[in-house]
Each structure stands twice: as C-alpha cells, then as structure tokens.
Regions:
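Active-site-proximal helices and loops of the catalytic beta/alpha 8
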Residues: 116, 177, 187-269, 302, ...
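Active-site clefts of carbohydrate-active enzymes
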Residues: 268-291
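Carbohydrate-interacting/catalytic domains
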Residues: 1-52, 58, 83, 88-89, ...
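Hydrophobic faces of well-ordered beta-strands that scaffold small-molecule active sites
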Residues: 8-11, 51-53, 96-98, 184, ...
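Conserved, mostly hydrophobic/aromatic
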Residues: 12, 43, 53, 69, ...
C-alpha cells in the first residue's frame, strides 16, 4: 500500500490564499507563498499528510492559463522560495502535490505567442488543437483554435503531438528532480488524451513508484481514468454531491446508495481510493451550501469515515463561507489569516476535524476497511467497516432530536472515540442513543491508542526535559496526568507516551 492510500490531504488555492493580485503585471517576484510555512503546525495538528497546491506555474490571471511550466508565478514568489517550502514541508512529514494544467494554456504561453508572431511559419502551429488559418479567433487572431469549454483565453493543447507531450512530461520531471514533489493533480482530466496519461504514468512511476497521480473528473465511469495504466485516483464528485444533499434533504438513503454502489459488496470502484471532498476552489463552501450549520461536523465525519482519501479545503475546517457569485470564484478563493481563524472561526468544528484526523490515523479499518450498511433511515445512518479482523461502526444522526439505533455486534464492548463515551453491549445487542446533530465512531473498548486522548495536551513543568515514565503533569482543570510508559505505534512507529489520569484511572496514548 502506498502512502497516499492512507493520507489526509489539504487543498490550497495559492493565488487566493496569499492575496495575490488578480492580474500578473510582470515585475519582480514577491514571495507571498512563504505564508504557508506559518501554517505547518496547524497542518500537523490536523494530521495532514500532503498539501495539494492549486496552480502555481506562471500565468496571467487565475493560474489555469499557464504561460511557463517551469516557473513559479511571480505573484507567489520564486522557484528558490518554493524549493525551500518543499524542503520544510518534507522535513515536517508533509508531501507536496502540484496542479498540472496540461489540457490547455494561456494566450501568453510562449509557443502560442510564437504562432501569433510568425503565423504559418511557426514550428508550433501543431501544438494547439484545431488551429487553422481558415478563419479568425474571437480575439482577432488571423487563425482559429479550440478554447477549453468555449473559453478562448484557455488555448487547448494538442496532446496527440508527442512534442507537446514531451514538453509537459519533461516539466514534470523538472519538478520531481529539483523540488522532490510527490504527486500531480490533473486539471480537466476528462479532456486529456488517454495515451498522454499512460505515458506520464510510465515516466513518473519509473522515477518514483509512489508518485501520486490524481485527475479531476466530474462525470462518467471513474475506472476509465483510475486504473493500473493511467491514474491512481480521481475526484469523487458523485459523493461530494451526495454528502451535502443527503443532509439538506434529510435523506441518508442518497449517500448510502452512492457509497454502496462504489464500495459496498460488489461495488464498482473497489480497489480504487477516490479523492473525497466536501468543497473546493470551484464549488460553494460547505458552510454556504448546507441549510443548517449543525450538519457541518456530520458531513466531515462521513467524509473521513467513508472509503477513499479525505481532503480539506483551506479554511473550511473553521467553517469559512463562500459562494460563486456574479460570475466570479473570488468568494471561494479568499485570502485567509490563520490567527483570525483561530480567534473567530468555528473552533468547535476545527476541534472536531483535529479529532477526526487522529482517529483516522489510529484505526486502519477507517482508512482501508470494507463498507457495509447496518441501518439506513432518512435521518440516521449506521455503517461498519472491517479490516484485518477489526471492526469500526460509524453512526450519524441529522435529526434535531435524540434518536436510538439498535444493532447486533460480535464485539464485547464498544466506545465512541469521538466523545469517549462507553457503549454497552448486552448479549451481542447494542442500543446507541444519539444526541441531535451528532456522529459517533464506535470501536472495541480494548483498543488503546492516541485517538482516545483528551483534547488538551500535557503542559510539562520543564519542556526541555525528555518525557520519562513516572513524570507527573498538573493540568489547568486540576487533574494530574502520570506517564506510565513509552511505546511505539504498531504501524507508523511514531513515538507514543502512555498517560494515566490519577483520579479516574483512564489510560490513553499520545
């Protein structure tokens, strides 16, 4: 299994994140993207494994109109700056994913400019789809060409031309060699030639077998793109829609149907880890889409617990709102200040996502387990995931009142690792009493790992002193935590400290 199969992704739209100017006027680069370094402790607290950077290559407008595949957009900074960012992220155990906009380029792309200047004498006429000199473009060029989706500021590349493919693949090799990037997200992957994907997969996997290849696909059979010859994963737009609409419509049958269709018994995408999300740079923020903000934590519990790779769009962990309005995506791609979010954002939601990140890392069945519906009602959903002899149950209640769910289990006792609440099992029967707008992740109560830890972190009297067995820490609430032993996580080998609350006797690891 590769690293990305167990990863939590964090998606940033760099030009918006940094507050860069809307239009690239040239001039000296400004190292705005260094701002991301200040977010590293935040990313680590969320258990993020990789940052997926939206477009960072040189462009004139929004980043999807590339002019140079080997240069960082001067509004974001320099190549040297980005190399430093990659190094620091890697030092902190965070991988780097770049946005590959390889279906089209901007009108200022160097080869297109050559065609504009030299006409039919340009050696690059065959680099662009549908280019011919029998007409004129909407911009007044003395030739016609294909624009992506009718946008003629986005010039479609001819990916059947191997010289074009070579140029793009060599650019990817440059970022792999010089910056040690760990993956590519392919923009508009449904428009890209399949042979190009096969070539770039062979190239990238030959250099780095665990290099992640993910494509933006909105409609269609995901297996056409996500398969052993092409991409590792694609965007799961089917379940993106199902997550929010199931809550807005109070109809869990919808999302349960989609997940079962994809990953249940006989599911059509078993063996493929799809890229799951609840919002991104192209769609309204989840907090603006939901009819009730109390659904937010339920949506994220579902996204982290369902099969696939969970991804969080920057700021949405704090309930940031944003809509596509007046034919503009600016509201979806704001400049955000982390300190402001930590002061005035939805802190309960953020703490919930931090907890989900810990739980996701602690229980392999959440990451790789099968999917089986146990109970589905309009307003309640309970499913189980099994992996290597372990079972996890996930329960959701979107009702504005309490709700009970009864089911059978082979486990002798359960605990909800979100709240820490023990759940009684009587002769194999369980009654789960759920609060309004709540979610639970139930595991066998004999599992002890760092997901069960309280939200607060021990404050050592002498922080420079290494933690040792027998150390005692006084907490703000008056409780005393004692270090009973040191251990290593069985999968990640992460160093863990085993604590015991001296009053309650509860034990956990962090």
């Amino acid at each position: 299994m590769n690293w990305y199969d167990n990863a939590i992704m964090y998606h940033i739209y760099p030009l918006g994140f940094c507050g860069a100017p809307k239009h690239n006027e040239g001039g000296e680069p400004v190292n705005r993207l260094e701002k991301v370094l200040d977010w590293i402790p935040h990313l680590k607290e969320m258990q993020v494994d990789a940052v997926y950077f939206g477009p960072i290559f040189e462009s004139v407008e929004h980043g999807y109109d590339t002019t140079d595949y080997r240069q960082i957009d001067r509004r974001l900074g320099t190549n040297e700056m980005f190399k430093h960012i990659c190094e620091v992220l890697h030092e902190n155990g965070i991988r780097v994913i770049l946005d590959g906009v390889f279906n089209h380029v901007g009108r200022n792309f160097w080869a297109f400019r050559d065609v504009q200047e030299k006409g039919q004498a340009s050696p690059y006429c065959d680099w662009f789809a549908g280019l011919n000199f029998g007409g004129s473009s909407p911009y007044g060029d003395p030739f016609w060409y294909e624009g992506w989706n009718g946008y003629y500021n986005l010039v479609k590349l001819n990916l059947k031309n191997w010289h074009v493919c070579d140029h793009l693949i060599e650019a990817v090799g440059y970022w792999m060699d010089e910056f040690q990037i760990d993956g590519i997200r392919f923009d508009a992957a449904d428009c890209v030639d399949f042979d190009f994907f096969k070539r770039i997969r062979s190239f990238c996997k030959g250099k780095k077998p665990d290099f992640w290849l993910m494509g933006e696909i909105i409609h269609g059979d995901y297996k056409r793109w996500a398969n052993p010859e092409m991409l590792d994963s694609v965007t799961n737009y089917e379940c993106y829609k199902g997550i929010y609409s199931s809550h807005n419509d109070k109809n869990y049958f919808e999302i349960n149907y989609s997940i079962n269709r994809q990953f249940g018994n006989g599911g059509i995408y078993q063996g493929i880890n799809l890229y799951n999300f609840v919002d991104n740079h192209d769609v309204n923020r989840l907090a603006s889409t939901l009819v009730d903000q109390r659904y937010l934590p339920l949506c994220y519990t579902l996204m982290y617990a369902m099969p696939g790779i969970p991804s969080v769009y920057y700021g949405s962990e704090y309930g940031v709102q944003g809509r596509h309005e007046n034919n503009s995506d600016d509201g979806l791609r704001p400049c955000l200040d982390l300190a402001d979010l930590q002061r005035s954002g939805n802190l309960d939601l953020y703490r919930h996502l931090v907890k989900l990140g810990r739980i996701y890392k602690a229980y392999p069945a959440l990451r790789t387990g099968s999917y089986e519906t146990v109970i589905v009602r309009n307003r309640q959903l309970l499913f189980r995931k099994d992996w290597d002899g372990t079972t996890v149950y996930v329960a959701l209640n979107l009702e504005d009142c309490c709700s009970d769910m009864q089911f059978g289990t082979h486990l002798p006792a359960l605990v909800d690792v979100i709240s820490g609440q023990p759940i009684d099992v009587n002769n194999g029967n369980v009654n789960v009493h759920m609060q309004p707008f709540s979610s639970m992740i139930l595991v066998a109560d004999d599992i002890v790992n760092h997901a069960d830890a309280p939200e607060t972190v021990p404050v050592a009297a002498e922080p420079e002193k290494p933690v040792e067995a027998g150390d005692r820490y006084q907490q703000e609430d008056g409780s005393v935590w004692k270090v009973v032993s040191l251990a290593s996580h069985v999968e990640t080998q992460e160093e863990l400290v085993i604590y015991q609350d001296e009053a309650s006797g509860k034990v956990w690891a962090m």
